[in-house]
Every structure is written in structure tokens, then in C-alpha cells.
């Protein structure tokens, strides 16, 4: 197959950041994606309806002229979140609330420390039809970073899912066989997003031959057996798995430093990279479901009706992009050749 046409995809997990960065990130995503679930981990985090509304306006202002791209907004759960916060957020158009264990990712220090205390909030979310998006890692310092996802399932996620059978839960950016197996065996109210980097890479690509800071993300890349389990999961065509890039930009100097930031900025190449994965797996016929159908179906939103076409044509990801402030950012797969390209008129 040398050409494939898909319903226009959506990105069910990304980070736009804020300020000048929006002038880069919003157009990059709006290029191909009709909608995107926008993460709320700003400084300070987006915790209520007023902050959501203001952030959404800043995103809309950064859209290219004529764009119909729609940001789907989320709020950041803390131990101070109340049922009224959920009601107000829902009224403001928020579709989901994000659970970050404190310290699990960029700007998550304000996040949840005592998870059981949030059970009344989860109950309110189920009642009001708001989805729960989960960064599924424990954060205790003595637990090995490669084991934190599996431990979270065992300690917390299994209990949340069992306690709230009507709450829709998205296990975000899964990285392990444990997570893929959990989602596959769970009831229909549980789904997962998978990033391009976790399908394309494993921890050798982070650490062998030198540290590769632009492949560093959280949850961290795992061993190849986990990568293969994720690839096998998407190749099944199961509606429980859908596209979420976790595109997460940091300026070059913040990645290439003594304490580099976590995140892969994949917005400029994500759909093409997913196509490459599905092609390698002999499962191109499953790409449209993963990219364009399973996400809106799970969220209870209409599928897009427009289309995008990819052609099998090699191109090279730019080595860097200059941000509006003049600083460079290194995109995911910088300088690498990709086999699929978006067909332009």
C-alpha cells in the first residue's frame, strides 16, 4: 500500500504549554488533528473552571487563521478538588479531569498525595459524566522507576476501576505489558492512549551509546518486551487503545542539560510515525480506528467527517525548530527519515 486516507484524527493527550510556546505548539497540532485533549499541568496548574476558560481562550488565539481546531479542556485534580469544582468545570465545557500522583511528571508537585481522599470526587465525576485521565505511576522514591506503572495498577488503578464501574477511565501513555493486559481485560469503561515513542523505541534507544535526552519522557521508555506488547496491542485493532501523542515540548537547553526535562515534542511527525509503526506491523488497516475512531467513540463525541491522506514517501524530520522567543526546540525523531508523509494539495 502506498497511500492511505483516514478520517481526520484527534490527539487524545498532549501538552501545549503556555505563553509564547502556544504560537508553536497549537499550529503544529492543528496542522493535522481536529481536536486534542489538553493537559492542565501549567504553573500554576489549571484546577478550576475559570482557569480552564482563560487557558482555552489563549489556545484559540494561537490557532492559524481559518483553523477549526478544537481544544478539549481538562482540569488538574488536587486533594482540594470538590464536587462543586467538577460541576462548574463540566458547565464550562471541560471533558475530563487529570489525576497526577504528586511528582510524577512536569509541574505535578501540586497533585494528589492521598488518593483515597479523592474517591468522593471520582463519584461526582461518574455522576456528571466527566472522564478520569490517569498518569499511572507511583512516586515513592524507593520504588524503581521502571516498576512504577505496574505498581500503580496493583495499588490504585484496579481499586478505582472496581469501585466506580460507571466512571470512564483513560490510562494514559501506557508503557508496559502489565498496562496493556490490564486495559484489555478490564470492562468497557477503561481505555488507554499510547504514544509514538513507546511504540517506536525502548530503553536501549535512551541509554545505549550515550544518553539520548530527546528520547527521555515520563513514563520512561521500558525494555523491548514491553514495547512489543504495546505494538501487539495496537495491531489487534482493539477499540480500547487510541492515539495520544503526549507531545511535550521543552526548549533545547532544558533537554540537553545536567538535569534534563522529560518530554518528546512529536506534533510535527506523530501521525506519520504512527503510520510507520502500523505499516511495519502489517496493520495499516487498523490505523484509522486507532487514530480517528476509538477516541471519539470512547469519549462519546462524534467522529470527524473530513479526511487526511498519507502517502508512502520519505522525508526527514527537521533537526530543530526555532520558537517565537528565538530559542531552538528539537522535535522527536529530529534528523531521522520517516517513510510516510501527509499528502498536500
From Swiss-Prot:
The task this protein performs is described as: Catalyzes the reversible cyclization of carbamoyl aspartate to dihydroorotate.
GO molecular function terms noted in the UniProt entry: dihydroorotase activity; zinc ion binding
Tell me what reaction this enzyme catalyses: (S)-dihydroorotate + H2O = N-carbamoyl-L-aspartate + H(+)
Name by which UniProt lists this protein: Dihydroorotase
Keyword Coiled coil belongs to the record: no
Q: In which pathway does it act?
A: Pyrimidine metabolism; UMP biosynthesis via de novo pathway; (S)-dihydroorotate from bicarbonate: step 3/3
Which InterPro entries does UniProt cross-reference here? Amidohydro-rel (IPR006680), DHOdimr (IPR004721), Dihydroorotase_CS (IPR002195), Metal_Hydrolase (IPR032466)
Organism for this UniProt entry: Shewanella pealeana (strain ATCC 700345 / ANG-SQ1)
Gene of origin?
pyrC
Amino acid at each position: 500500500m502506498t497511500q492511505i486516507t483516514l478520517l481526520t484524527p484527534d490527539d487524545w493527550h498532549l501538552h501545549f504549554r503556555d505563553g509564547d510556546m502556544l504560537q508553536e505548539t497549537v499550529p503544529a497540532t492543528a496542522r493535522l488533528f481536529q481536536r486534542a485533549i489538553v493537559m492542565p499541568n501549567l504553573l500554576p496548574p489549571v484546577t478550576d473552571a475559570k482557569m480552564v476558560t482563560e487557558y482555552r481562550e489563549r489556545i484559540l488565539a494561537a490557532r492559524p487563521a481559518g483553523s477549526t481546531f478544537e481544544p478539549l479542556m481538562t482540569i488538574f485534580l488536587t486533594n482540594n478538588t470538590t464536587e462543586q469544582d467538577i460541576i462548574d468545570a463540566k458547565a464550562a465545557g471541560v471533558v475530563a479531569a487529570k489525576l497526577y500522583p504528586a511528582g510524577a511528571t512536569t509541574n505535578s508537585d501540586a497533585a494528589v498525595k492521598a488518593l483515597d481522599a479523592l474517591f468522593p470526587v471520582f463519584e461526582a465525576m461518574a455522576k456528571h459524566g466527566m472522564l478520569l485521565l490517569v498518569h499511572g505511576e507511583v512516586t515513592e522514591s524507593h520504588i524503581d522507576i521502571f516498576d512504577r506503572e505496574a505498581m500503580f495498577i496493583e495499588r490504585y488503578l484496579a481499586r478505582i476501576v472496581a469501585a466506580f464501574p460507571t466512571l470512564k477511565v483513560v490510562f494514559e501513555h501506557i508503557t508496559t505489558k502489565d498496562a496493556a493486559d490490564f486495559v484489555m481485560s478490564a470492562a468497557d469503561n477503561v481505555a488507554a492512549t499510547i504514544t509514538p515513542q513507546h511504540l517506536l523505541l525502548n530503553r536501549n534507544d535512551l541509554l545505549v551509546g550515550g544518553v539520548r535526552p530527546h528520547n527521555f519522557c515520563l513514563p520512561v521508555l521500558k525494555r523491548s518486551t514491553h514495547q512489543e506488547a504495546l505494538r501487539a496491542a495496537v495491531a489487534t485493532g482493539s477499540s480500547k487503545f487510541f492515539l495520544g501523542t503526549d507531545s511535550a515540548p521543552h526548549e533545547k537547553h532544558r533537554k540537553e542539560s545536567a538535569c534534563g526535562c522529560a518530554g518528546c515534542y512529536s506534533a510535527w511527525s506523530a501521525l506519520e510515525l504512527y503510520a510507520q509503526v502500523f505499516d511495519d506491523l502489517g496493520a495499516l488497516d487498523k490505523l484509522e480506528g486507532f487514530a480517528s475512531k476509538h477516541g471519539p467513540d470512547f469519549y462519546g463525541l462524534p467522529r470527524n467527517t473530513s479526511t487526511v491522506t498519507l502517502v508512502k514517501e520519505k522525508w526527514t524530520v527537521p533537526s530543530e525548530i526555532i520558537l517565537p522567543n528565538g530559542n531552538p526546540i528539537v522535535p522527536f525523531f529530529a534528523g531521522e527519515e520517516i517513510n510516510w508523509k501527509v499528502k498536500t494539495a
